[in-house]
């Protein structure tokens, strides 16, 4: 049935996230306003809520909310026997089961919205809509060339450090393995460094005791202290043996892939949005204060630009305003705490 979305509100349980992308990008639906019952539940039943009366929930999935707020019961998806199947492969019985499953979900979402809307501030509905549009109707333009250049630089720097370490450790061994396995030298070194067991063996080979710590899961057991946050591992990066220090620093680089991941995510996101980059945020995502929290590549927490150029600068510097607009940058120290103190007083 045709619907005039220009004067309608599209409400879904994950409409401020995945569902809105499907609706807008795959189905071409552009409603007058977006509503999200999951977002509303996060705000209304957060630990610090002051306008509802303080019921805290164990989660905001449709199943949990429907049960805890007594608006109905969600059906069992497993019973539809459709998991892992494409629609084209559904039997008639499976299509009928899925139709019933979806009808119940839709009915639960409608009941949930009617429950949550009571006492819910109208301006917060506007913020949920705004948050959703920052995702599905992005305005920031990405300078993809700048991001791609930074990504190449990061990968080349890692590769160079791994090759240098391979030479220091004995390139002949790795070269022989390369001929046998077809694996590149840098990939072999990467594997040696990424594995705690293999890195421990490397330390032993270099005459350095493997640092140990009490196992976080079993206090009676000791385990290698080789995580990037372990003080003993951090100390290895300034070891008197330069080979040990180099290996420790290279292991840290291998384990730290956040920058590469974010740069790649920027490129992928812009590729599917005609060169523009979505800003995915979770409304009321912070458990204590109820502020927005970062999603995906966390646009709320991009690395600062320091006095010396770094590849991570590309994350901020690649963001461009659309034609006719400017980006105004503002960053205040301790702003979350200060805003909450202000709200507490008023």
Annotated model-derived regions:
Residues 1-2, 336:
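Metal-dependent nuclease catalytic cores that hydrolyze phosphodiester bonds in DNA/RNA
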Residues 29-30, 119, 172, 346:
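Secondary-structure transition/capping motifs at alpha-helix termini
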Residues 2-7, 321-322:
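Flexible, charged surface loops at secondary-structure boundaries
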Residues 7-117, 124, 128:
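Active-site-proximal helix-loop-helix substrate-binding element of RNase H-like nuclease domains
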Residues 57, 67-68, 81-314, 320-326, ...:
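Conserved "right-hand" nucleotidyltransferase catalytic core of DNA-directed polymerases
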Residues 16-28, 42-46, 198-207, 333-346:
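Short active-site loop/helix that positions an aromatic residue
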Residues 28, 319-320:
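Short, conserved catalytic or adaptor-binding loops enriched in Gly and charged residues
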Residues 11, 34-35, 142, 327-331:
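Short hydrophobic beta-strand that contains or immediately precedes a catalytic carboxylate
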């Amino acid at each position: 049935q045709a619907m005039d979305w220009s004067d309608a509100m599209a409400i879904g349980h994950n409409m401020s996230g995945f569902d809105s992308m499907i609706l807008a990008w795959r189905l071409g639906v552009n409603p007058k306003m977006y509503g999200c019952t999951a977002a509303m539940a996060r705000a209304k039943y957060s630990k610090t809520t002051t306008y509802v009366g303080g019921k805290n929930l164990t989660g905001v999935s449709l199943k949990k909310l429907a049960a805890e707020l007594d608006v109905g019961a969600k059906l069992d998806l497993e019973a539809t026997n459709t998991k892992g199947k494409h629609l084209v492969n559904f039997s008639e019985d499976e299509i009928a089961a899925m139709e019933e499953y979806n009808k119940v979900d839709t009915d639960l979402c409608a009941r949930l919205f009617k429950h949550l809307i009571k006492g819910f501030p109208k301006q917060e509905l506007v913020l949920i809509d705004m948050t959703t549009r920052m995702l599905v109707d992005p305005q920031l333009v990405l300078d993809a060339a700048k991001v791609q250049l930074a990504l190449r630089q990061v990968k080349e720097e890692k590769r160079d450090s791994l090759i240098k370490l391979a030479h220091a450790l004995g390139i002949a061994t790795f070269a022989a393995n390369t001929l046998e396995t077809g694996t590149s030298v840098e990939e072999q070194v990467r594997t040696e460094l990424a594995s705690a067991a293999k890195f421990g063996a490397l330390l032993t080979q270099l005459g350095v005791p493997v640092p140990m710590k009490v196992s976080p899961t079993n206090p009676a057991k000791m385990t290698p202290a080789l995580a990037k946050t372990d003080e003993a591992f951090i100390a290895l990066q300034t070891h008197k043996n330069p080979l040990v220090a180099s290996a420790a620093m290279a292991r840290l680089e291998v384990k730290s892939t956040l920058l590469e991941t974010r740069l790649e995510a920027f490129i992928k996101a812009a590729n599917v949005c005609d060169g523009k980059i979505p800003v995915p945020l979770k409304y009321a995502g912070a458990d204590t204060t109820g502020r927005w929290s970062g999603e995906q590549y966390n646009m709320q927490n991009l690395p600062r630009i320091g006095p010396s150029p770094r590849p991570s600068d590309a994350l901020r510097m690649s963001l461009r305003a659309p034609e006719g607009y400017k980006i105004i940058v503002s960053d205040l120290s301790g702003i979350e705490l200060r805003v909450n103190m202000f709200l507490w007083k008023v």
